[in-house]
Amino acid sequence: MTLLCLFSLVNIFFIPEWANLFGEQSEQQIFLTPTPRVNAYFALGSTVFILSLLLSVFLIQIRRYQFKKIETIFYLFIGASLIVPINFLREFTAIFNYYPQLSYAAHGLLKHFVFPYKVIILIVVAIAFIKVVRSQTTSLIKYVNALALLLAPIIVVTYGNLFSKLYSAAHLVSLQNVISPSQIKNWDGPKVRWLIFDEMDYRLVFDDRPKGIKLPELDRLQKEAIFSSAAYPPNDYTIEAVPSLLSGARKSVITIKSEDLVLRNLITHTDEKWADISNIFRDVKDLGSTTALVGWYHNYCPVFKTDLDYCRRLPAGRFGYDESFFGSVLVILERAFILDKRLERAFIFNLEVITRRSLDRTISNNYGLSFFHFSVPHSPWIFDQIKGKTSPYILRSPEQYFGNMLLVDKIIGEFRRTLEANGEWNKSTLIISSDHSWRKSAEYDSKRDFRVPFIIKMADGKARVINKPIGTIVTKNFILEVMKKKISTTDEAVSWLQEQSKDFPKGTILIPFKDEETATSPSKKLDSKKAKG
């Protein structure tokens, strides 16, 4: 009976996680989040059962040695922890997906009260403890056990869903997350590596960089590449900027349709699904070359599944779980008892996948075009500047942006060394840029600059500076010129880029973004807290 009661209460305690894993997902969540893997389901089911078992053993030992006061305190905490399911109301679960107005109303009403629920638990425990000390404890234990038995049928619901998902586990690992390397022919033509670092800000990285921040790899690259001091992105949000960059035309998001986006061309004002729009990968494959993509945020693999020889997409944030069993257990326990660090851990995991698991694979497989979309230096802050390594426990202050920039610099260094080790550094065209600048830079120094880095290293490794304004929207056409062997040297690249700058800002960008609402923010239909990137 003891195990059943505690099993029921622990199961209820983890209701927010059950809802997160099994709740009906919105179109937006489906688009932004990879399908959970089997490990996540095993992790949650095992965590609830093992924690219940451990608590039961603990309680049995307390009763065995007749520690009445400890038993009372134990039941106080167990009873008070039932406040946690209130947090369920903050989650966009099935019932709220059917009634969006209720979802937004509940979130707006509870966000100021529910968030510090752990503090509320402590207050309730303190008050209850005082009352119980003055009265008998038998009634407390009786009521808690009665409530546990009343809620026990929910175990059947949660674990019934769990076993149902595991039974149909074949659909959990799909092309939504990964497209495995195909049998590709050896490509001996031009090779382009395109790196996008999310929210990298030109002004703060180069013009106004703090004196104590050293970025040796970026500074070194600046001396052997084409360097633009006035490059502007096509949009100010990842959800629109990346489709614009990959298609070579400015787009705004109309809506999210499960695994795809409906986009509007801001020049022709026509609407199309992202998968149907011409993109750099399709054009490169039409030239007979090969393509690879590894990136976070967007639902790349289903969108470009016929245009890529290799694809690995990574979670956009809070809805995701770690791919390993123990990693998922850590995420679940951390969120329940300490802090919700899923976003930080997702970012760290993303970098691990890109830099240590996918980098060698994409380079060694000799792809003609490799596209990498890194989550840093976008928040959350995940780099410990003192210890020089990633950590999910970094102080949330604007100054920590530069910690993430140190991580960017390390990644560029690792990328260079990998290319050099494979004999590709002096044979490849390397493009480093960003989808947008740091939107919250005003929190750091009260300034906002829309410029992003735009660095192009040609095979000959010559340094040149372009000071004329240019839109990074030209990147797609530039890559095609390289793949066609019409551009192969730094001089040819500079000449082509300067020619493109003559049309700026026609069809490339509007400065500032506020001149056009659709270029300022994603569609109002989207939840801004989850859609922005």
Regions found by a protein language model. Name each.
Residues 1-533:
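Catalytic domains that recognize anionic headgroups
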